[in-house]
From Swiss-Prot:
Keywords: Glycoprotein, Hydrolase, Metal-binding, Protease, Secreted, Signal, Zinc. Its cofactor is Zn(2+). The lineage of its organism: Eukaryota, Fungi, Dikarya, Ascomycota, Pezizomycotina. GO terms for molecular function: metal ion binding; peptidase activity. GO terms for biological process: proteolysis. Glycans are attached at N140, N315. This is Peptidase M20 domain-containing protein SMAC_03666.2. Its main location: secreted. The keyword tRNA-binding does not apply. It is found in: Secreted. PROSITE patterns: ARGE_DAPE_CPG2_1, ARGE_DAPE_CPG2_2. Zn(2+) 1 binds at D186, E221. Residues 1-28 form the signal peptide.
């Protein structure tokens, strides 16, 4: 038994070792499927949401308001654009350890694949980027059944914190006060609400602290490398033949869902489409081949095509992010390229991306047998999440998350305050009441996931 306990503690320390794009045009396939509000289904990929779910009393401020707003403000005030998350990570380590008394560790991304059991250092953060792992209980770091997680990186540019009150005193702040700044929604609102929710449940003795673990990852807005690192290390430890180790029963992911419980989100694939032509004088286009011309023709067909759809996730949509080509207006271009981001609504998580790729490859051959090269950059199909929880309205998201980056047989829940429609914009923000509603929502989800 002693050997097993030591291994569990070793596993506890060993763990340390792609957004919604609404394309505005008049084509059927570039819009979500319209869902009849009169239907029995409560899932809608189209609606613009309003706050819902278990909510805090909006007349009387909850006892945790001051701590919630203070934590949220501190997180926003620290710039953490993807790949530069170290300072906000240091803040969280200090906050979780010194303010809450949790066990908190840094999980460095570098070197994780070669030696997952020796990649931590609690004090020296010069090793580079790191995830933040925290356990409310120090009794057994390997016993948690529910993972509560979100991301601490944000998109550029940095936007300072602001709250719409004449004073920041507790008396002046109401549930209608508006908080803005980069990350105020995506996803520092979720981070703050999750931490407060966990602490409130523990203080009320509604959960066993040993059942919970917190994970705040880097890199979600770019490649998902933070969650992918955690997944690799976690699953390497789980696959160890030395002893059976406990597995998470559920993972609760924090992302802006307007405090609705997401039933899943579209998948994603994409890459760079390159066209090769024959350069020549622009006065004689029939003698040469314009790379930009055939590229535009192919892109038009891709946008107009039915790349797959489903009742839950709507239509697969395409965003042409960048187009480049040619050297001068009077030269027929030899080369042209475009970067595509495709939100996949067909198939399942394992097959959806392949369905879309096959459809795109077929279109390219129809336009020109030899001119195109498509460099695909990974991908996955629609991601399902559990949304069968009493007290929540539901939705389906068109953006990507870290849900597919954490491999395992756990149940996934996707929920959080704020709207994705402002998440990456200059007007990113949400109301105090939305934050407080999220705290209550996370409390409900945690208790549901634990079967409490």
């Amino acid at each position: 038994m002693k050997a097993t306990s030591n291994l569990l503690l070793l596993w506890g320390t060993s763990l340390l070792s792609p957004s919604s794009a609404f394309v505005i045009d008049n084509h059927h396939y570039q819009h979500p499927l319209v869902v009849d509000d009169s239907s029995s289904s409560s899932i809608s990929p189209l609606k613009i949401f309003t706050s819902s779910g278990p909510s805090a009393n909006k007349e009387d401020a909850p006892s945790y308001r001051k701590n919630l707003l203070s934590l949220h403000k501190s997180l926003i005030e620290i710039p953490s654009i993807s790949r530069t998350e170290q300072e906000v990570g240091k803040f969280l380590l200090d906050y979780l350890r010194n303010n809450l008394g949790y066990i908190a560790k840094a999980q460095f991304l570098e070197g994780s694949s070669s030696d997952p059991f020796s990649q931590y250092d609690d004090d020296d953060h010069s090793q580079g980027r790191f995830n933040v792992l925290a356990w409310p209980s120090s009794h057994n770091l390997s016993s948690p059944r529910v993972l509560v997680t979100s991301h601490i990186d944000v998109v550029p540019p940095f936007i300072p914190y602001h709250i719409s009150t004449s004073s920041e005193s507790d008396e002046e702040i109401t549930s209608d006060a508006f908080i803005s700044g980069r990350g105020s929604v995506d996803a520092k609102a979720s981070v703050a609400a999750q931490i407060v929710a966990v602490e409130e449940l523990i203080r009320a003795k509604e959960v066993d602290p040993a059942d919970l673990m917190l994970l705040f990852v880097v890199g979600e807005e770019i490649s998902g490398d933070g969650m992918k690192t955690f997944s690799v290390v976690y699953n390497d430890a789980e696959k160890s033949k030395k002893e059976e180790l406990p597995r998470f029963k559920a993972a609760i992911y924090g992302e802006p869902t307007e405090n609705k419980l997401s039933c899943g989100h579209k998948g994603h694939t994409g890459g760079v489409l390159k066209a090769t032509g024959i350069a020549g004088h622009s006065g004689y286009p029939w003698l040469f081949k314009s790379a930009t011309e055939i590229l535009v023709k192919a892109l038009a067909k891709i946008i107009d095509a039915d790349l797959g759809s489903s009742e839950r996730y709507g239509n697969t949509t395409v965003n042409i992010g960048t187009i480049a080509g040619g050297v001068a207006a009077n030269v027929i271009p030899k080369e042209a390229s475009a970067k595509l981001a495709i939100r996949v609504a067909a198939g399942n998580q394992a097959t959806g991306a392949d369905i879309v790729r096959s459809a795109v490859d077929k279109i390219l051959k129809e336009v020109d047998e030899e001119a195109f090269t498509m460099e695909w950059a990974g991908g996955y199909g629609p991601v399902e999440c559990d949304c069968d929880v009493d007290g929540f309205e539901t939705m389906v998201a068109s953006y990507g998350t870290d849900v597919p980056n954490f491999e395992g047989d756990h149940v996934s829940y996707l929920y959080g305050p704020g709207s994705i429609l402002v998440a990456h914009g200059d007007d990113e923000g949400l109301k105090v009441g939305d934050l407080e509603t999220a705290v209550e929502g996370y409390k409900t989800l945690i208790k549901h996931a634990l079967g409490a």
